[in-house]
Curated annotation (Swiss-Prot):
Family named by the database record: Belongs to the apolipoprotein A1/A4/E family.
The protein's name in its UniProt record: Apolipoprotein E
Record's function text: APOE is an apolipoprotein, a protein associating with lipid particles, that mainly functions in lipoprotein-mediated lipid transport between organs via the plasma and interstitial fluids. APOE is a core component of plasma lipoproteins and is involved in their production, conversion and clearance. Apolipoproteins are amphipathic molecules that interact both with lipids of the lipoprotein particle core and the aqueous environment of the plasma.
Species whose genome carries this gene: Octodon degus
Annotated segments matching region Specificity for association with VLDL: 261-273
Higher taxonomy: Eukaryota, Metazoa, Chordata, Craniata, Vertebrata
Annotated heparin binding sites: 156-159, 219-226
């Protein structure tokens, strides 16, 4: 039993020693001091966390209030806003890129951005937890809390550095894609300008011709157009003549047919009337003859 207790005590002492043993300092990239706005904002956050890690008397005093977490919140928001602004700026130049490639790059960049934001959020939450523990002091000494906080901050700074470098690389890929799209846009503009310059050169050459030559060219073009119109008019006139001749022939044929039908309709009627008239005359003559007395002979 004594041996077991001794082992437990040694283990606890070794763990405490491991907590307070200093780790190598994490060196931040120099580019965070002179890079993009988001890198400068992240550098300010990084410097603030490094100052908090010193756990000086001033840090201890501010950690017991909400000042440190408030300042970290402002630095976090500045960093993420700068990242979003830089990403939006690059997206404006990614228009010529294929949609699937652009979607993949955007998804990877958002994931890296979220990881960095989570790292900064965890730093702030850890400091808030330390403040609560210091105020409560639940069975722990201040030295133990400070040692544990220092260890956590070192680990968080390492992870934040790794995620920041990953975000930096993905933004570089994004920027390369934007540069490639911009180069394609410049090439298209260059080709368009070349075409416009060639058109301007042709116009300038035509403008530089003597007025007489230009007038002759216009006159020749006008004569050709007049000949074309005259030929079209003659063809149209001949076509109208043929159509009028066809109409005349049709009208004559219809008139002759109508005359034939009219004659066939009237002739039987006239013949019948003539026959009836002759019969009537014969009847009248017969009646008149019958009614006239025969003269008597005298002795």
């Amino acid at each position: 039993m004594k041996v077991l207790c001794t082992v437990l005590v040694v283990t606890l002492l070794a763990g405490c020693r491991a907590d307070v043993e200093p780790e190598p300092e994490v060196l931040e990239p120099a580019v965070w001091k002179s890079g993009q706005p988001w890198e400068l904002a992240l550098g300010r956050f990084w410097d603030y966390v490094r100052w908090v890690q010193t756990l000086s008397d001033q840090v201890q005093e501010e950690l017991l209030s909400s000042q440190v977490t408030q300042e970290l919140t402002v630095l976090m928001e500045d960093t993420m806003k700068a990242v979003k602004a830089y990403k939006s700026e690059l997206e404006q130049e990614l228009v010529p890129m294929a949609e699937d490639t652009k979607a993949r790059l955007s998804k990877e960049l958002q994931a890296a951005q979220a990881r960095l934001g989570a790292d900064m959020e965890e730093v702030r939450n850890r400091l808030a937890q330390y403040r609560n523990e210091m105020q409560a002091m639940l069975g722990q000494s201040a030295d133990e809390l400070r040692a544990r906080l220092a260890s956590h901050l070192r680990k968080l700074r390492k992870r934040m550095l790794r995620d920041a470098e990953d975000l930096q690389k993905r933004l570089a890929v994004y920027k390369d894609g934007a540069s490639e799209g911009a180069e394609r846009g410049v090439s298209a503009i260059r080709e368009r300008l070349g075409s416009l310059v060639e058109q301007s050169r042709v116009r300038a050459a035509l403008t530089g011709q003597p007025l007489q030559e230009r007038a002759q060219a216009w006159g020749k073009q006008l004569r050709g157009r007049l000949e074309e119109v005259r030929g079209q008019a003659q063809d149209r006139l001949e076509e109208m003549r043929e159509q009028m001749e066809e109409v005349r022939v049709k009208i004559e044929e219809q008139a002759e047919a109508f005359q034939t039908r009219l004659k066939g309709w009237f002739e039987p009627m006239v013949e019948d009337m003539r026959r009836q008239w002759a019969d009537l005359i014969e009847k009248v003559q017969a009646a008149v003859g019958a009614s006239t007395p025969v003269p008597s002979q005298k002795p």
